[in-house]
């Protein structure tokens, strides 16, 4: 009986560990600051499964522009970065992170394009992705929603200023405000 | 105790009703027939929640083109169609359905764009959407995945043949092969 009880507790603990999620808000920018969004209801929820080394992320937009594609990405703050993050390719200069300046802040980054939030007639949409297994490490990152879809991916619009610009960032409010994600 | 058992049974039955899902395969076309896809592992899973009148659809692509955007949509076979399907726009704006000829078959359709499957370095990707509440009725429809993203949505590629064409249809294999979905 004691053994069964211990097993149940262990199972419960592992479920809790795998599903402990962090929720964070979007903020405006880092390129566009007038794109509509309900900042109270919009959010990003992410969690790490330490057993599978997988990162789950759900992007939720509420009250954005109706019937629009927002490509969602992670920007890693780094000096060098591997060619992939989980099953997604990274955008670097042969492994070296690329220096960009936004909101007067200059930092070296590697970008990973994860997918697209498509909004409905109310400007609402969600997109969920499971990334991994991810190489163990501590990652300093910022989530971004671009003003369109196509950068670094086949079949979308051109990766020009109109489509690539950051409409929303998280955490923010300034480029370089970061979230730390640890993959054990 | 008997009352508790009955309540539990009712709860279980309602959960079962809401989550009964249909799985169907993709087939090639109806425009492009050379786009790579593991037709055995790729699928669409859909279910109707009769209580909320919501339709849940998951599009899964396996071994498609890596790092590509596939916009997923529904073609309804109809004579007239409302301006919206749940919270998504009818591309034709509502009213009379529009004749479309593919694979030698001509049918009147209304199209609704639901979102985007983004593939990873292996050509795998999935996208889930919950549509509704949907007007009660019986819908004859075919799912399809376009060769890019942007048709009838802001922020993607232009809706030219390169991006609008259907790479995959379901059920198929011929345009007009339909799935019937009933919203009570």
Locations of regions flagged by a protein language model:
Chain A
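Positively charged n-region of N-terminal signal peptides that target proteins for export
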Residues: 1-4
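Bacterial N-terminal signal peptides
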Residues: 7-15
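N-terminal leader/targeting pre-sequences
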Residues: 20-184
């Amino acid at each position: 009986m004691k053994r069964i009880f211990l097993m149940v507790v262990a199972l419960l603990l592992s479920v809790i560990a795998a599903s402990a999620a962090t929720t964070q808000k979007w903020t405006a920018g880092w390129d566009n600051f007038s794109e509509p969004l309900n900042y109270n209801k919009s959010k990003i929820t992410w969690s790490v499964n330490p057993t599978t080394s997988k990162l789950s992320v759900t992007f939720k937009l509420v009250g954005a522009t109706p019937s629009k594609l927002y490509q969602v990405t992670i920007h890693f703050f780094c000096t060098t970065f591997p060619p992939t993050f989980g099953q997604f390719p990274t955008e670097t200069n042969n492994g070296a992170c690329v220096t960009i300046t936004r909101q007067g802040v200059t930092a070296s980054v590697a970008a990973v394009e994860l997918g697209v939030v498509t909004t409905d007639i109310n400007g609402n949409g969600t997109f969920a992705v499971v990334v991994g297994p991810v190489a163990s490490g501590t990652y300093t990152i910022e989530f971004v929603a671009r003003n369109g879809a196509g950068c670094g991916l086949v079949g979308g619009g051109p990766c020009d200023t109109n489509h690539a610009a950051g409409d929303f960032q998280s955490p923010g409010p300034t480029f370089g405000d970061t979230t730390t994600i640890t993959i054990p | 105790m008997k009352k508790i058992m009955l309540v539990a049974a009712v709860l279980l039955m309602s959960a079962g009703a809401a989550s009964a899902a249909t799985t169907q395969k993709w087939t090639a076309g109806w425009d492009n027939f050379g786009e790579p896809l593991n037709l055995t592992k790729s699928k669409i899973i859909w279910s109707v929640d009769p209580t909320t009148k919501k339709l849940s659809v998951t599009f899964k692509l396996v071994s498609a083109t890596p790092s590509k955007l596939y916009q997923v949509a529904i073609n309804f076979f109809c004579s007239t169609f409302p301006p919206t399907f749940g919270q998504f726009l009818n591309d034709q704006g509502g009213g009379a359905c529009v004749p479309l000829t593919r694979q030698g078959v001509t049918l009147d359709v209304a199209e609704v764009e639901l979102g985007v499957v983004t593939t990873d370095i292996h050509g795998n990707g999935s996208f889930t959407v919950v549509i509704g509440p949907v007007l009660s009725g019986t819908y004859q429809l075919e799912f399809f995945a376009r060769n890019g993203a942007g048709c009838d949505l802001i922020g993607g590629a232009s809706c030219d043949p390169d991006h609008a064409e259907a790479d995959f249809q379901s059920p198929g294999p011929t345009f007009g092969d339909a799935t019937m979905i009933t919203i009570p």
